[in-house]
């Protein structure tokens, strides 16, 4: 299939970010209905090539956009897509990539707090995006809905688990889309589709009421610009009653940090990893970014938390993370079975999911407690590096460029092949799900025409520093106009 078929003509609205589109609506250049209808037209035109949007809410979206009750928030009339995994909307499907939920016609009975915040900000939800089953692999090829294709080259994956979201934004269907990240699932698809992907600190964006903050997953968006990542975070970073973890507030709205002068920061660099061979193009992107940061006046040094490249530390963490991941899969299968009203069986889920959930059920309470202890020691070991006076860490986002479709899926007799082959793509991202630190992937590299990203990591609670420096890099390299071959 290759590069796909570009759309005829160019949609000027599709070149606006969410902040820019909201400004155009406020100025009267177009109405919320016109904004939403344009997004619907783009989805209908582009999605047959990509399979990014699996549930369409077009009639509801147009009615919402036309309603006098549409909230007059910062994104009034801007269309958005929601990932079909844990971001729930009452009365709408929530299938988490699972055939059993699809076949049962399962719908949610409540809005996630984050979805409520989107609505209060004036966003208009136009549909839900594809995701691998329970978000367990770094590609988006669920049995339930089929593969999502990368708009830069449709033979390749857009990444996962927010691959549907990333493909939709990269092709210009909507300016931003909800995404989640439990091991890299915001940052990996952002890197593979040439987008900005900010993973907030644990407890910054509430997972309530149906999910918890103590795990490794967080939610936010994939988008084209740092100002969108910042301004949408301002709109959604409001705690929900009963949240067990709430990230510290640094007082100043994130959107006011866009374009801020920071003075000279100390930024460490990690180019490689002892666990995998990093592709030369991914290393080259980091070297180029290090040069850009130095040109901006920052001190860029060859330094990183030693635990990131220590064999003993990383092997211990890999085991602990795998335990946590498997237990999470088991809990998710049980939770969704309860909501469906029956116990799920092997025939209800993909082989990899069933195998991983079985592993999770097989761990003892001691195994799980030990994993939490290892992860706590890891958090403290990494935090010490930032406490010693380092402001940011620069790494590749992924070790490899985007894979071809089918490379990260299970094989006959190898149910965990997808998860195992996903690991090199999450080598640089998953450690910061463990620590809960904020990290951002920026589209500052390429490999044979496909995007690759670089990652900046800040201390816990310091998304403001990521916005500061990310926007400085964005001014120096205007990536927002770099468009995929399949784009509106």
Tell me what each language-model feature is.
Residues 20-27, 81, 101-106, 217-224, ...:
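Short, well-ordered beta-strand elements within core beta-sheets of diverse protein domains
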Residues 108-240, 393, 433-434, 438-446, ...:
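Short glycine/serine-rich loop segments
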Residues 101-108, 153-156, 414-426:
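A short acidic, glycine-rich active-site loop
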Residues 1-71, 235-426, 434, 461, ...:
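Amidase signature
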Residues 74-114:
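Enzymes and membrane/adaptor proteins characterized by extended Gly/Ser/Thr/Asp/Glu-rich
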């Amino acid at each position: 299939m290759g590069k796909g078929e570009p759309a005829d003509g160019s949609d000027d609205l599709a070149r606006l970010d969410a902040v820019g589109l909201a400004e155009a609506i406020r100025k009267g250049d177009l109405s919320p209905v016109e904004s939403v209808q344009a997004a619907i037209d783009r989805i209908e035109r582009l999605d047959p090539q990509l399979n990014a949007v699996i549930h369409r809410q077009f009639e509801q979206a147009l009615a919402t956009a036309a309603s006098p009750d549409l909230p007059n928030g910062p994104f009034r009339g801007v269309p958005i897509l929601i990932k079909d995994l844990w971001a729930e909307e009452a009365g709408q499907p929530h299938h988490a990539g699972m055939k059993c939920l699809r076949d049962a016609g399962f719908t949610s009975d409540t809005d996630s707090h984050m979805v409520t915040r989107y609505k209060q900000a004036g966003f208009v939800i136009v549909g839900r995006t594809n995701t691998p089953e329970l978000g367990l692999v770094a590609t988006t090829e669920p049995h339930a809905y089929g593969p999502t294709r990368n708009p830069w080259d449709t033979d390749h994956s857009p990444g996962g688990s927010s691959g549907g979201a990333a493909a939709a934004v990269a092709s210009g269907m909507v300016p931003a889309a909800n995404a989640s990240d439990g091991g890299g699932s915001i940052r990996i698809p952002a890197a593979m589709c040439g987008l900005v992907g900010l993973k907030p600190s644990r407890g910054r964006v509430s997972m309530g009421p149906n999910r918890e903050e103590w795990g490794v997953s967080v939610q936010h968006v994939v988008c084209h610009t740092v100002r969108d990542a910042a301004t949408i975070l301002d709109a959604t970073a409001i705690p929900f009653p009963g949240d067990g973890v709430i990230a510290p507030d640094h007082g100043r709205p994130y959107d006011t940090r866009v374009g801020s002068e920071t003075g000279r920061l100390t930024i460490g660099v990690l180019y490689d990893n002892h666990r995998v061979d990093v592709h030369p193009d991914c290393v080259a992107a980091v070297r180029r970014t290090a040069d850009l940061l130095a040109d901006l006046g920052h001190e860029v040094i060859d330094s990183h938390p030693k635990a990131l490249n220590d064999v003993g530390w990383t092997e211990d963490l890999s085991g602990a993370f795998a335990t946590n991941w498997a237990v999470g899969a088991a809990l998710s299968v049980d939770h969704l079975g309860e909501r469906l009203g029956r116990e799920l069986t092997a025939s209800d889920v993909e082989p990899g999911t069933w195998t991983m959930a079985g592993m999770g059920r097989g761990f003892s309470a001691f195994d799980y407690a030990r994993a939490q202890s290892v992860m706590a020691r890891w958090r403290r070991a990494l935090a010490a590096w930032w406490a010693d006076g380092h402001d940011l860490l620069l790494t590749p986002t992924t070790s490899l460029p985007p894979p071809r479709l089918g490379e990260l899926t299970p094989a006959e007799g190898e149910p965990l092949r997808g998860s195992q082959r996903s690991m090199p793509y999450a080598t640089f991202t998953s450690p910061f799900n463990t620590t809960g630190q904020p990290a951002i992937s920026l589209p500052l590299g390429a490999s044979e025409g496909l995007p690759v990203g670089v990652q900046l990591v800040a201390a816990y609670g310091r998304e403001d520093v990521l916005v500061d420096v990310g926007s400085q890099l964005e001014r120096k390299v205007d990536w927002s106009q770099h468009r995929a071959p399949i784009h509106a």
